[in-house]
Structure formats: C-alpha cells, structure tokens
Amino acid sequence: MCIRDRTVNPQVHCGAYGFNLGDFQGGQAEYLFVPYADFNLLKFPDNDAAMEKIRDLALLSDVLPTAFHGLMEAGVKVGSTVYIAGAGPVGRAAAAAARLIGAAAIIVGDYDKERLDLVKRNGCETIDLSQDIPLADQIEAILGVPEVDCAVDYVGSEAHGIGHEAHELQPQAAINQVLAATRAGGATG
C-alpha cells in the first residue's frame, strides 16, 4: 500500500524487491519504500472492498504464498519428513502449511530461541543452530536417520554459520544446510 492510494501490481515478481534494488527493508512493516512506485503499483479496483479484507489480503500477498510455494517446490506431501531452515514469519507459515499438507515430521532450524519456542508449541521439532552440533546429527537424533525427504530455505542471504560460526554472516549457509539435510533423491525448495 502507499500512503496516497491503495495499490497492487500482479505483474511484479517479489524478487524485484530483494537485494538487487538496494537495502529496502520492511515489507511486513506499516510503511515501506517501493522503488519506481510510479509504474510498479496499480490501484485496487475497489478500495472499500479491499480495506474490508485487508488482513486476509496482507497475509495472502507475501508470507503464506512464499511459504507454500517453497513446500510445493520441494515436493512436500502426506508422509514427508521436512526440514525448514528459518523460524521467522515465512518459516513458521511453512511449518503450519506442512502440517496441513500432512507431513509426517516437521523440523525447524533457527538461532532464535523465542522463534523456536513458537514452532515447538505448534507441534514441530526444533534444532537450535547456535549449538556446535552438526545439523545431520541433530536431524538423526529426531528421526533416526540423518536426512529428510524435503527441505526448504526460508532464510536466504541473511544466513549465518552454525555453532561457533553463528556470529558470521554466511549467505550460502542456509542453502548448504538445506542441501546437506536432504536425502539422495529428495527435493529442496
């Protein structure tokens, strides 16, 4: 939304608002900066109808579709074992969606203990990545095998290392964890 008008553009992929346009953060904030808003945004056809459903529209515009798309890309289905890298809003939405899909086991890894507590209270297994324990060992302690059927990265380029490397920004860390956590013949998203 912009301050003067309620707007949306279904033609713009969310990737356009990533690091390629600079450090514009706050897509889930009350206000955000949209580069090139003069052509990136279109008015809602019916502003009053949009405002009545704004909470539903906000959820469907970013967090849940991103979470669900990652699960679909990874081939999550009934009975799958799933590793979710990241317990932020998108990772938590993915954990809830994986449960609705019927995943047999949902494991969420993160450094933030409060976020991990949230997903644990919702029935997921958790992995505290600040511990100096290899991810495969932590997965094996939960499942009895060191790998999952499907894994998805909901961290991206803000990833950090595991354990004693947790203070270091390592953009490749989350995707490397996802790849290492997935069994041969499994899939990632």
Where are these regions (language model features)?
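Mid-domain Rossmann-like dinucleotide-binding core that forms the NAD(H)/NADP(H) cofactor-binding site
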Residues: K43, A49-D132, D137, V152
